[in-house]
A protein has these predicted regions:
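Flexible glycine/proline-rich
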Residues: 1-66
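Short, surface-exposed beta-edge/turn micro-motifs
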Residues: 3, 35-36, 148-150, 165-166
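Short, solvent-exposed amphipathic alpha-helical segments in soluble enzyme
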Residues: 9-12, 85-89
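Conserved beta-strand termini and adjacent loop/short-helix elements that scaffold enzyme active sites
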Residues: 22, 74, 96-98, 145, ...
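Short loop->beta-strand "edge-of-pocket" segments that line small-molecule binding or catalytic clefts
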Residues: 66-75, 160-174
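N-terminal winged-helix
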Residues: 69-88
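N-terminal segment of the mature folded domain
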Residues: 87-160
Length: 174
């Protein structure tokens, strides 16, 4: 096999360097612009496992990489907006959209600084029950950055019975 180099965003969480690789495939041109490093995947491996150490080559100054805020979890346009505002202040927020539960797992494992989430519990409460379940004794701060109303949009007037007979296109992953 051949060694492979994968573009990634890197940041320092507590005392560990964390790399978040960009997905392979379409859109790679923007990955070059947004990446902070290249990760080396050895020739004898197809991929790296989560948490596995590897060599990385920084493409930004070390001091910049140390100040990156890694945000992993649900995709929320508000985070993108905040990242744009932070950039003007010299703060780089790098987000990866993996879904609320995967974001909480990354936060628990120390792989990110922040985890956007929107999880509705069986009792109708958002987020707090999941934090209590997965972070029992740890000190966390839950910041509500906004509320939103979501729905299903259609060109035709539909009722709930029509949901079974129509096709829907889901949003992006995360």
């Amino acid at each position: 096999g051949f060694e492979e180099f994968v573009q990634a965003i890197v940041g320092k969480v507590q005392d560990k360097w964390i790399a978040v690789p960009f997905p392979r495939g379409a859109g790679r041109q923007m990955h070059v612009v947004r990446s902070h490093a290249f990760l080396k995947v050895p020739a004898n491996k197809k991929t790296l496992k989560t948490g596995e150490a590897t060599d990385a080559h920084l493409t930004v100054p070390h001091t910049m990489a140390e100040q990156v805020v890694l945000v992993t979890g649900s995709h929320d346009p508000a985070i993108d907006y905040l990242a744009d505002l932070a950039k003007d202040a010299g703060i780089h927020i790098a987000s990866s959209h993996v879904g609320s539960m995967n974001g909480l797992a990354a936060l628990r494992q120390g792989f990110c600084h922040l985890a956007p989430m929107h999880l509705l519990s069986d009792d109708g409460e958002y987020n707090t029950p999941y934090l209590k379940k997965h972070f029992s004794e740890e000190e966390l701060v839950l910041i509500c950055i906004g509320e939103r109303i979501q729905g299903i949009v259609s060109k035709e007037i539909l009722g709930f019975d029509d949901i079974l007979t129509h096709r829907f296109i889901n949003r992006q992953k995360g």
